[in-house]
Amino acid sequence: MALLCGLGQVTLRLWVSLPFQTENRIGFLAAGAFLRSGGMEALTTQLGPGREGSSSPNSKQELQPYSGSSALKPNQVGETSLYGVPIVSLVIDGQERLCLAQISNTLLKNYSYNEIHNRRVALGITCVQCTPVQLEILRRAGAMPISSRRCGMITKREAERLCKSFLGEHKPPKLPENFAFDVVHECAWGSRGSFIPARYNSSRAKCIKCGYCSMYFSPNKFIFHSHRTPDAKYTQPDAANFNSWRRHLKLSDKSATDELSHAWEDVKAMFNGGTRKRTFSLQGGGGGGANSGSGGAGKGGAGGGGGPGCGSEMAPGPPPHKSLRCGEDEASGPPGPPPPHPQRALGLAAAANGPAGPGGPGGSAGVRSYPVIPVPSKGFGLLQKLPPPLFPHPYGFPTAFGLCPKKDDPVLVAGEPKGGPGTGSGGGAGTAAGAGGPGAGHLPPGAGPGPGGGTMFWGHQPSGAAKDAAAVAAAAAAATVYPTFPMFWPAAGSLPVPPYPAAQSQAKAVAAAVAAAAAAAAAAAGGGGPESLDGAEPAKEGSLGTEERCPSALSRGPLDEDGADEALPPSLAPLAPPPPPPARKSSYVSAFRPVVKDAESIAKLYGSAREAYGSGPARGPVPGTGTGGGYVSPDFLSEGSSSYHSASPDVDTADEPEVDVESNRFPDEEGAQEDTEPSVPSTGGGPDGDQPAGPPSVTSSGADGPTDSADGDSPRPRRRLGPPPAIRSAFGDLVADDVVRRTERSPPNGGYELREPCGPLGGPAAAKVYVPERDEHVKSAAAAAALGPAASYLCTPETHEPDKEDNHSTTADDLETRKSFSDQRSVSQPSPANTDRGEDGLTLDVTGTQLVEKDIENLAREELQKLLLEQMELRKKLEREFQSLKDNFQDQMKRELAYREEMVQQLQIVRDTLCNELDQERKARYAIQQKLKEAHDALHHFSCKMLTPRHCTGNCSFKPPLLP
């Protein structure tokens, strides 16, 4: 080609130019070294579109003296096809150049001027400005709009490179394996060396070997390195800043072939910031490409999120932030939060597990099985190195609530993970994810139920579903091993945070079924009856929200298990409660619970909510689980209402057998109840559900009641003391609330009353244990609940029952009804509650009943009256507080109004002063203008007289200024 005359060469390039891809190809062996080193490959993608070729003005074509330029007449107009689009060309200085503006408006119209300009500079393309004559020619040829004032022209080869950088495929030039460019620079005394493309895998790579001293330099350092040879003359580099090397480094062979010079341009364009669309090939490993090129392991490892090459050591890191998600990545799912320990990588295919990837192969591509926590590329290495303690699993970035779970993150959504239920088995996340979806979602990173992570469910797996028996067992074990601290994320349930409610409910249903299938499920259930979110599954008592109870409600203690079982959907309930993970026992107060010590304030705060909940779908959280309610926000308020452990059973348990706060049952009972419970939920649901109006307070009672009744058959030692929450529903909403609040279960502890702070509120609110603040209440409650022991549960119902039945209306009458009711009941008829509640529970323990009768006869009236008085006092107190709040608020409003008026006045003053100043300035300006005009006119007049007396004789057109 070089032989062809300039014309030939150019035209050849224009018309024959090989398909763009081939342009860069020097046909030698496909650069093995390159590829091997990962260097070029990475580069290519790195280069991102366009960077590849960079033609410097010296590109062959331009330099070539066009001997035959005569054939190309100056300013000759032609048309060239670029990527199929006709572009006007013009011969300038013997070279055919294309109109850059036309290219920008056609081929590159989707890119901004800045992008095109920056890419052009990065590629080293110099733009020649055309003369006005040439511009006119271009306008007439239709290349430029009439309004244009200038036009830059670039050669065809440069235009191809520019377009290819935006539109084409980006392969680094293919060079032979041990190829090197012989380069020289003339900065200072100059130097020469070999530029080894295979080593050029980052902008700072030491890829130039000095020909004199054989040391290696990076391109931008090499131009500062020179050897003073005898014949060398010193040249002050014009712009020797670090990145000008592309201009100063030239091929030593001035007559290099086109292919060679084009390859050189492409190499020079490689790490030039031309394109910000960095697509790092899988080689995320390099933390951004720096040394990524080197190892296969690196490639794909981090980047692929466990993708292809993933050496187990790399698997965990999230890919360097920039890494492009390649197909594989996507398939495997973006790498999740860096798992604290590589092997435990959650989805990350338990490190070595390979493609199991976040979702395992199943992890449907693209679906994020868990939120990606972007880690800046440099640091990501650190995460892996951090000592595990940094992210102990219990709260490592839980995938469950990844830093910010996206509602769509499949796993989180209880339904089926987006990936499709199937995903589950695939990867660590699989079991849970697939099975129940949510399940896995909540595992802490280390916990992939599958492979390496002890599946520690956070607290418990929020979704009841998705627990395989195995997983469950693991969960229990894990839980024991790593106490689940609801640390960052209060245990999954502690807040509504937990899995998205709605989904959850469905998931729960499903989950329930699934779980039921596996006995283990029950175990898991300990951790996780699906938690019910507020209204989410009002009806499902089974889910009862209890699941979450444990961590969040804290109410669950050892009982929790039971609670969990209660929570379990009926089908599950029967399973034996798993031993609760020890960790659970300690009740943590959820950070999210309002720290309000007295139920009243909470009631005040959330009273309305309560009612809403109470009446809401059959009381939102399932009654059965007091705690479930706990989760309900109101409930949870109530739960938290006493900021001390709401009902942490542990507390009670000090002297007495643990009683589920919610149900006031002994654990043993619970066992029994659990069996019956399934029915309970339904019953609870029934009664409670039935009386939506009934303050959820019923919940505990309801749940308890039903359960009791259910159990009722199996006489189980009932807590004689606990006047149950029975009262709760009995009273009207508030009454119920308060009653509930008051209802203390008078445990032997007596010390704690069971109060449902917001009965209605939480409806589900479990009866809470309160400090003996109101022992009297306790007693009264006991009396009231007179149901006392056995009945106490049922009794509660009794009382409840009255409530329930009569008091659905939840009015003060309830109290009376209750009284009468209790009296009647005292008769020891099976408490209506029982009858009411569940036929199953019809039989009361006789002993319980008798006790109840006595208690009721003796205490009921007085207690009820006391309660009534208390309620009245409470109400008055609330009214007073409300009044004071109102007054404060009004004062504040007044203050704010006064302040606002003051501000308005000040603004007015400022505005007035500004206006005055402006007026004065205007006047001053006007005066100055007048003076200037006068001076000007005077000068004009004077000059007329002086300079042209002849023309101005007598009839001068000057008119004296009109004086104001």
From Swiss-Prot:
Residues 857-921 form a coiled coil. Residues 345-355 have a biased composition (Low complexity). Residues 283-310, 356-365, 417-440 have a biased composition (Gly residues). It is found in: Nucleus. Residues 798-808 have a biased composition (Basic and acidic residues). The keyword Nucleus applies. Keywords: Coiled coil, Nucleus, Repressor, Transcription, Transcription regulation. Disulfide bonds: none annotated. GO terms for cellular component: cytoplasm; dendrite; neuronal cell body; nucleus; transcription regulator complex. Residues 823-834 have a biased composition (Polar residues). Residues 45-72, 278-365, 414-452, 525-587, 610-766, 793-842 are annotated as: Disordered. Residues 652-661 have a biased composition (Acidic residues). GO terms for biological process: negative regulation of BMP signaling pathway; negative regulation of DNA-templated transcription; negative regulation of transcription by RNA polymerase II. Residues 571-583 have a biased composition (Pro residues). Pfam families: c-SKI_SMAD_bind (PF08782), Ski_Sno_DHD (PF02437). GO terms for molecular function: DNA-binding transcription factor activity, RNA polymerase II-specific; RNA polymerase II cis-regulatory region sequence-specific DNA binding; sequence-specific double-stranded DNA binding; SMAD binding. Belongs to the SKI family. Interacts with LBX1. Interacts with SMAD1, SMAD2 and SMAD3. Inhibits BMP signaling. Acts as a transcriptional corepressor of LBX1. This is SKI family transcriptional corepressor 1. The gene is Skor1.
